[in-house]
């Protein structure tokens, strides 16, 4: 199959199709995974029977021949498909669709090959994406389905078929690897060769073509709307450790998919999403870090939505057209009539090949290649002059003074004939025919007509549409340049001027008017080109690292920070080299004194303040040095402690945050570097400052430990070993409070211990209340049901146990009321502590209800807190469903009792 796809020749019918394959050259397709399994040998029905050796050899030869024949048949099918795709045009669409369905798509392998060919063709030719999308719609409906009948989906949604599934899989693969081929060339340090520039241009066209093809398929409901939203979110999302200026390719793809399928997605249900997308695009549009071209693309896309998705005329007719439509557009926009090809006997090339025609006037047909065959003849051989059209042959009956306008064959510029060009005999002939009148006052008024603003132009081009008369080109603009160095001499500016802004053709004098001869025309102004300034190539990576080493060494010796910053500025380093330069700054100071390390940290902070480096640059540099730790530890054993100092100073100077530092160090990566960094922060600042900063960061400390140590007991042990247990005072309280209650359960002693050991700030913390209530409940349970007693949770406790439980709870009542009184939210936390305690004890019979009644009767918890606990919905504490089931009847009684009391008070 791969060979047939790679060869990609036209089918044997292509000779009679008439030049249909001129839109794209054959491409080599990559091998696809999963095809070889369809080409292997398959055992026959008698695989289990004993077969003589001679017969086996014959069967092996037969199987090999069958496999070869099968491969040849597949090759023939794929060649025929390639030929059909090469001939696909709007006129032949229905006919070629039937041919494609009848090529012999009888297996999933062949269908997959057809999809690969169609997708690759659509990626090569983005202008024809809508045509290939229509082809996919037809194949999705009519191609064989090898997956079997599927369950009925939602109404209005396309049924999933083999074709649709394989197509989406291929497009997903192209989308996920969209920038891979372009990045290969963008990451080169040296300038690209012309061949590499061409390959990069092809890769970029295929990347944008894939996005446009996805959008066209989305228009036809072949791709679900949710998939389109996922694509847009992926393109808008800023990746980790990716600079904003490196998002250009994704943002260009984003603009392409918005232009293609934006109107379909912008409906009432998705309005909030679209508003978020465009708010993000507006913010990116104002970012100076992005290239100007990307910012203008974003601006055009935002303006497109503001104008209710009505594109400018330049984008209206950007799809495939029939030949008749192209001819009609030429008449309407250019004033050029391009007749259909005639018989050779009906043509008269009097002006093009006559004896009086100057050599410069003979247009060369070769540069246009197959375009000339499609148009029938060259543009300019028949020129429109108002409502009538001057034909490409001379006839005396067409008017006494009418004649063809003469155009320069290279750029379509009006060229006044002179005596020296035509010769004496030619000059007399031209005068006798009145052709000199065509150039009277030719240069006047031409530039003023070009200066008018066109409605079809973007606002930023409204003041740039001024051209000289010798800059106008009538050649059809190329869709792209394969090589940036191959720039047309007279074409670049005219491609930005829409047809409505181009100057009108010069009118010939009316019939009967005497031509005025001998008038001089103003010569065109010659603009002097500014002298080319030779640009100094950017320094290489090795040069930058050497310069960085020199600057940093001088800075560490002299301490002049401003001189070091200016030295880095003068390097004019590309931004993608900054992380390695910062890594060099860190490494150079690692084996020096603490003062030098502090100087290096200050230099990095200054570079950020000057706008040279960013937080992402520092994190990339920091991680680069961490990756080199095994080598560095040979010469610098305490390298992780020194790196922790750099990280701590970066956090203090707000170069990075604790959460940004923690993210790449999760699951014990480079353990114990994160804890060493916290130690340095506590040393450089103070404990209270670090505790507040750490709590604001919302970092999960358990996740920062190796997986084997990710539990509370082990975490507390490690933190105590590093002197960081002050970060989690409640974790330490949970372990020590129960121990203190067992030593002396009197309320006075417990309250005094809490007051002496727990910060007053934590007395109103929900976590503290949870631990306090849990400790009391655990102590009561251990006293009522000692661990030595084997009690069944399903059996009811004795009267003595119930009385003991009540008396113990009464003894702790003063402490509970001290911390819970008038705090409904803390009372709800106390109820959740009771719920979790019962859950961990497997909900002993009647325990939850008994404690609810005790809390209510002893006025420890108010009615409002009980009802708030009932209505609260949270997944943080387990066992809520079973707990509600056990106390629901009592809570209902509580609600009715409260209502009766309120009614009595009202009476």
From Swiss-Prot:
> What family does the database annotate?
Belongs to the eukaryotic initiation factor 4G family.
Q: Where is this region: Disordered?
A: 1-71, 498-541
Against InterPro entries, the record matches this protein to: ARM-type_fold, Initiation_fac_eIF4g_MI, MIF4G-like_typ-3, W2_domain
User: Does the keyword Oxidoreductase belong to this entry?
Assistant: no
Residue list for modification Omega-N-methylarginine: 360, 505
Indicate what this protein is called per its UniProt record: Eukaryotic translation initiation factor 4 gamma 2
Residues annotated as carrying N-acetylmethionine in the record are 1
Q: Which organism is it from?
A: Oryctolagus cuniculus (Rabbit)
The Polar residues compositionally biased stretches are 503-516
Modified sites of kind Phosphothreonine: 89, 508, 514
Q: Which UniProt keywords apply?
A: Acetylation, Initiation factor, Isopeptide bond, Methylation, Phosphoprotein, Protein biosynthesis, Repressor, Translation regulation, Ubl conjugation
Give the N6-methyllysine positions (modified residues): 431
The record's listing under Pfam families reads: MA3 (PF02847), MIF4G (PF02854), W2 (PF02020)
Q: Pinpoint the MI domain residues.
A: 543-666
Q: Does the keyword Phosphoprotein apply?
A: yes
Under SMART domains, the record lists: eIF5C (SM00515), MA3 (SM00544), MIF4G (SM00543)
**SUPFAM superfamilies from the entry?**
ARM repeat
| Stretches assigned to the MIF4G domain | 78-308
Phosphoserine: residues carrying this PTM? 11, 395, 443, 902
Among the entry's GO cellular component annotations, what is one? Answer: eukaryotic translation initiation factor 4F complex
The cross-link Glycyl lysine isopeptide (Lys-Gly) (interchain with G-Cter in SUMO2) sits at 575
Function noted in UniProt: Appears to play a role in the switch from cap-dependent to IRES-mediated translation during mitosis, apoptosis and viral infection. Cleaved by some caspases and viral proteases.
Q: How is it modified after translation?
A: Phosphorylation; hyperphosphorylated during mitosis.
Top-level taxon of origin: Eukaryota
Transmembrane stretches, start-end: none
| GO MF annotations in UniProt | mRNA binding; translation factor activity, RNA binding; translation initiation factor activity
Domain W2 stretches: 720-904
């Amino acid at each position: 199959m791969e060979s047939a796809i790679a060869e990609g020749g036209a089918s044997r019918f292509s000779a009679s199709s008439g030049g249909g394959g001129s839109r794209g050259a054959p491409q080599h397709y990559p091998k696809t995974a999963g095809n070889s399994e369809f080409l292997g040998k398959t055992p026959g029905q008698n695989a289990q029977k004993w077969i003589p050796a001679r017969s086996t050899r014959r069967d092996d030869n037969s199987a090999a021949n069958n496999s070869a024949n099968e491969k040849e048949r597949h090759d023939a099918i794929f060649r025929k498909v390639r030929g059909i795709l090469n001939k696909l045009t709007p006129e032949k669409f229905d006919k070629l669709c039937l041919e494609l369905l009848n090529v012999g798509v009888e297996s999933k392998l062949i269908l997959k090959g057809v999809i690969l060919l169609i997708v690759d063709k659509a990626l090569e030719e983005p202008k024809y994406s809508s045509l290939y999308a229509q082809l996919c719609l037809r194949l999705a409906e009519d191609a064989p389905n090898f997956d079997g009948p599927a369950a009925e989906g939602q109404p209005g949604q396309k049924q999933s078929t083999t074709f649709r599934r394989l197509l989406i899989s291929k497009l997903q693969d192209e989308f996920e690897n969209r920038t891979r081929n372009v990045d290969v060339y963008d990451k080169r340090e040296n300038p690209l060769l012309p061949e590499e520039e061409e390959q990069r241009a092809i890769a970029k066209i295929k990347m944008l073509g894939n996005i446009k093809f996805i959008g066209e398929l989305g228009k036809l409901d072949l791709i679900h709307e949710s998939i389109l939203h996922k694509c847009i979110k992926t393109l808008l999302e800023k990746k980790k450790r990716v600079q904003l200026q490196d998002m250009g390719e994704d943002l260009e793809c984003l603009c392409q998919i918005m232009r293609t399928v934006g109107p379909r997605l912008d409906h009432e249900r998705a309005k909030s999403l679209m508003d978020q997308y465009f708010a993000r695009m507006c913010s990116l549009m104002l970012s100076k870090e992005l290239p100007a071209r990307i910012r203008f693309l974003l601006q055009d896309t935002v303006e497109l939505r503001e104008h209710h998705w009505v594109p400018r005329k330049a984008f209206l007719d950007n799809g495939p057209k029939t030949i008749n439509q192209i001819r009609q557009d030429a008449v309407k926009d250019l004033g050029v009539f391009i007749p259909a090809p005639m018989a050779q006997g009906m043509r008269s090339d009097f002006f093009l090949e006559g004896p009086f025609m100057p050599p410069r006037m003979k247009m060369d047909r070769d540069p246009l290649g197959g375009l000339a065959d499609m148009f029938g003849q060259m543009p300019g051989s028949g020129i429109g002059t108002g409502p009538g059209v001057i034909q490409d042959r001379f006839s005396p009956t067409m008017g006494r003074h009418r004649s063809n306008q003469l155009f320069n064959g290279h750029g379509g510029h009006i060229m006044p004939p002179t005596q020296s060009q035509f010769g004496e005999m030619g000059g007399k002939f031209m005068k006798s025919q009145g052709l000199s009148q065509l150039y009277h006052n030719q240069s006047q008024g031409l530039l003023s007509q070009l200066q008018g603003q066109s409605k079809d132009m973007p606002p930023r081009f409204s003041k740039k549409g001024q051209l000289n008369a010798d800059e106008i080109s009538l050649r059809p603009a190329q869709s792209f340049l394969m090589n940036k160095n191959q720039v047309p001499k007279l074409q670049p500016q005219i491609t930005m001027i829409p047809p409505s802004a181009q100057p009108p053709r010069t009118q010939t004098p009316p019939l009967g008017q005497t031509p005025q001869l001998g008038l001089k025309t103003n010569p065109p102004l010659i603009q002097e080109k500014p002298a080319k300034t030779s640009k100094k190539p950017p320094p290489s990576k090795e040069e930058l690292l050497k310069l960085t080493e020199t600057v940093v060494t001088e800075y560490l010796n002299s301490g002049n920070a401003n001189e070091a910053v200016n030295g880095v500025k003068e390097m004019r380093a590309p931004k993608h080299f900054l992380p390695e330069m910062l890594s060099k700054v860190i490494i150079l100071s690692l084996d020096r004194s603490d003062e030098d390390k502090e100087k290096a940290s200050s230099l990095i902070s200054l570079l950020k303040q000057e706008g040279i480096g960013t937080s992402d640059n520092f994190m990339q540099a920091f991680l680069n040095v961490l990756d080199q730790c095994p080598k560095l530890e040979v010469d610098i054993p305490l390298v992780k402690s020194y790196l922790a100092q750099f990280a701590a100073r970066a956090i203090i100077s707000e170069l990075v945050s604790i959460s940004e530092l923690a993210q790449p160090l999760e699951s014990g990566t480079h353990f114990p570097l994160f804890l060493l960094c916290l130690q340095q922060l506590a040393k450089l600042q103070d404990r209270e400052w670090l505790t507040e900063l750490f709590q604001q960061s919302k970092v999960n400390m358990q996740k920062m430990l190796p997986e084997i140590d990710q539990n509370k007991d082990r975490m507390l042990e490690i933190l105590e070993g590093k002197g960081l247990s002050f970060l989690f005072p409640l974790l330490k309280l949970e372990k020590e409070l129960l121990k203190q209650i067992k030593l002396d359960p009197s309320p006075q002693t417990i309250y005094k211990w809490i007051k002496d050991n727990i910060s007053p700030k934590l007395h109103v913390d929900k976590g503290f209340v949870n631990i306090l209530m849990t400790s009391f409940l655990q102590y009561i349970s251990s006293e009522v049901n000692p661990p030595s007693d084997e009690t069944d949770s399903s059996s009811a406790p004795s009267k003595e146990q119930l009385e003991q439980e009540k008396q113990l709870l009464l003894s702790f009542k003063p402490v509970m009321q001290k911390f819970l009184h008038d705090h409904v939210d803390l009372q709800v936390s106390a109820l959740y502590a009771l719920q979790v305690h019962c859950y961990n004890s497997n909900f002993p019979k009647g325990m939850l209800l008994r404690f609810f009644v005790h809390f209510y009767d002893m006025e420890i918890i108010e009615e409002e807190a009980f009802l708030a606990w009932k209505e609260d919905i949270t997944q943080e504490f387990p066992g809520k469903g079973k707990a509600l089931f056990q106390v629901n009847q009592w809570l209902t009684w509580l609600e009715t009792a409260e209502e009766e009391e309120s009614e009595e008070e009202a009476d």
